[in-house]
């Protein structure tokens, strides 16, 4: 988003299912800000160590150095207030405290760019993204490709594991599915069983 100028802060939200390019889009915007010689700071939650401990990493392996925080509140304690652009990846691991932090940063004149899942593995709104969508100035909704039928996918399908709301995983535990192919929760039929059944059918 390039229409806001001057010392006015704002919030941009990039949301969608896993494998839809959210982190990739976040990195792209942050790199553009760096090219524009803006002071940029990047944060990610400590729980997200799937690909790197101290980098934002997209599923396509784009990388950017980031600070690691245990909570959203830690961002305000660690940020250099001279920064002009603040990026936050994996917002769902930050908790609802991120809403107040993002508001405070934007109110202080910063461009805040946040990426995260908008729905959980049950297909329900996944905090804090819904509230950030209501408060933000710019929203980008990304779609993935359904691995079953090839249609646009808006859901993150959990394939195995527990019923806990937050379970960190990648392609070994999740896949993108469209509205028709999505099964809230953990599906009874595994992907291997699905492929076998398709071949036999």
Protein language model features and the residues they cover:
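Short acidic/histidine-rich motifs immediately flanking catalytic phosphotransfer sites
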Residues: 81-85, 91
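Conserved ATPase-coupling elements of RecA-like P-loop NTPase cores
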Residues: 90-105, 121-126
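Short basic (Lys/Arg) and small-residue
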Residues: 136
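Anion (oxyanion) recognition and catalysis
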Residues: 34, 106-107
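Conserved P-loop
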Residues: 1-81, 120-131, 141-144, 160, ...
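Structural recognition of the conserved hydrophobic beta-strand(s) that form the central parallel beta-sheet
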Residues: 87, 111-118
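A charged, well-structured terminal subsegment
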Residues: 143-163
């Amino acid at each position: 988003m390039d229409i806001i100028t001057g010392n006015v802060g704002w919030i941009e939200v990039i949301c969608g299912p896993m494998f839809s390019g959210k982190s990739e889009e976040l990195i792209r915007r942050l790199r553009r800000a760096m090219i524009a010689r803006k002071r940029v700071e990047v944060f990610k939650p400590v729980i997200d160590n799937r690909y790197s401990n101290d980098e934002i990493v997209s599923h396509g392996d784009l990388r950017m150095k980031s600070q690691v925080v245990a909570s959203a509140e830690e961002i305000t304690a660690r940020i250099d207030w001279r920064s002009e652009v603040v990026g936050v990846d994996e917002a769902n691991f930050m908790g609802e405290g991120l809403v107040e932090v993002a508001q405070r940063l934007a109110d202080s004149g910063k461009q805040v760019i946040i990426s995260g899942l908008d729905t959980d593995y049950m297909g329900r709104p996944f905090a804090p993204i819904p509230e950030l969508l209501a408060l933000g100035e710019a929203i980008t909704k990304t779609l993935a490709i359904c691995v079953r039928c090839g249609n646009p996918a808006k859901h993150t399908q959990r394939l195995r594991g527990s019923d806990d709301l937050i379970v960190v995983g990648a392609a070994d535990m999740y896949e993108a599915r469209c509205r028709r192919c999505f099964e809230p929760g953990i599906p009874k039929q595994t992907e291997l069983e699905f492929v076998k059944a398709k071949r036999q059918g």
